[in-house]
Amino acid sequence: MYQRMLRCGAELGSPGGGGGGGGGGGAGGRLALLWIVPLTLSGLLGVAWGASSLGAHHIHHFHGSSKHHSVPIAIYRSPASLRGGHAGTTYIFSKGGGQITYKWPPNDRPSTRADRLAIGFSTVQKEAVLVRVDSSSGLGDYLELHIHQGKIGVKFNVGTDDIAIEESNAIINDGKYHVVRFTRSGGNATLQVDSWPVIERYPAGNNDNERLAIARQRIPYRLGRVVDEWLLDKGRQLTIFNSQATIIIGGKEQGQPFQGQLSGLYYNGLKVLNMAAENDANIAIVGNVRLVGEVPSSMTTESTATAMQSEMSTSIMETTTTLATSTARRGKPPTKEPISQTTDDILVASAECPSDDEDIDPCEPSSGGLANPTRAGGREPYPGSAEVIRESSSTTGMVVGIVAAAALCILILLYAMYKYRNRDEGSYHVDESRNYISNSAQSNGAVVKEKQPSSAKSSNKNKKNKDKEYYV
């Protein structure tokens, strides 16, 4: 390819046919070489830059059951601090009960198709309500994390019927520290306690949600409520938790006050206990509730190791991003060093809802972000923590490199054309005239040289003739 371009440059550079082809070909070859080499180098530079940028932006995918593909899940993984045994901000709910209430602003109440909840706790109660999320007045949607007969369970309703899921094998009212993780995707739900297997719940009438969601997009907006009512009459499971208004922690309002320790609550990206410790304006605290500066005393290195094994063996639902590996993923054994208090870092999630199937409020993703675990006192983050970078930015380096290479090549080509067009044409004409004169002289000389023998012969002949006449 390179040699072919050089030959083309040589042909373009030759002024005439065969006589001036040598000098013109050399100039054309040099001209082609002048812009081909920078073009190649610029292209390689752009590709290398784009490849390096592409390699720096990576996203991990963890897939669970295939039944959860109806909704894209933002994140559901235990962060590094929980895997290492750090409980986060901790509150003690004493005898008589207390309550921490978070209220969304009236104009910022989210409606979600997927919810994520995680919390650490220790208690000896057989009956209590830990966390409850309620929708606006009159809607009736709710989600409740509770203890019933010493077992942890979740009950929720998003417009159809109450759906319950419970871990019946784990006893959690033993005074030890436990971590519970709950996810909801439409009417589907999963629940996990510590390192126990994940419990999954798929209610009836929820198998055709994907097809119904596609069909729902083609239904005119004015007919949305009619279609929803018809689907509801047919027993279809609704999926959106509409207009979430309050998060109630402690269960005092429900008549089953919690007594014990609650740590590091996360709900759809909200670090509620951390916000309470910072005296957030949207949070109210009543009753016998106090903030403590250390993790639950009942937590031991054995429970830490259990949580680490749970993280390494568990993959809950489909995810599109994750935190970086921690000491547990690297296989380091649990240490017996004293554990310092950290910020809430059990779970950060962002519930998403690509399409709405209920005509009450437009579905809006909750305002949540991904938080990196930090050491106590606001020092540097734990080793292994990483920022989440979206996949859409992974091609930025490639595009910038290609554009820069193309611009550089165009500039070089324009400069070469400018130099080629403005070179000294007088010298070319002088050289051409000289060649022409010399060629003419040479050709005339050749003709003269060729004719000299014939003229000599004629003179000799005349001389002989004269001699003959003279002698005769």
Curated annotation (Swiss-Prot):
| GO terms classed as biological process | adult behavior; AMPA selective glutamate receptor signaling pathway; angiogenesis; calcium-dependent cell-cell adhesion via plasma membrane cell adhesion molecules; cellular response to calcium ion; cerebellar granule cell differentiation; establishment of protein localization; gamma-aminobutyric acid receptor clustering
Q: Which residues cross the membrane?
A: 397-417
Signal sequence: where?
A: 1-50
List modified residues, type Phosphoserine.
454-455, 458
List all annotated glycosylation positions: 188, 350
Q: Which residues lie on this side of the membrane: Cytoplasmic?
A: 418-472
**PTM (free text):** O-glycosylated; contains heparan sulfate. Heparan sulfate attachment is required for synapse development by mediating interactions with neuroligins.
Q: Which GO terms describe its molecular function?
A: calcium-dependent protein binding; cell adhesion molecule binding; metal ion binding; neuroligin family protein binding; signaling receptor binding; transmembrane signaling receptor activity; type 1 fibroblast growth factor receptor binding
The entry's Ca(2+)-binding residues are: 141, 158, 240, 242
Its recorded name reads Neurexin-1-beta
**Gene coding for it:** NRXN1
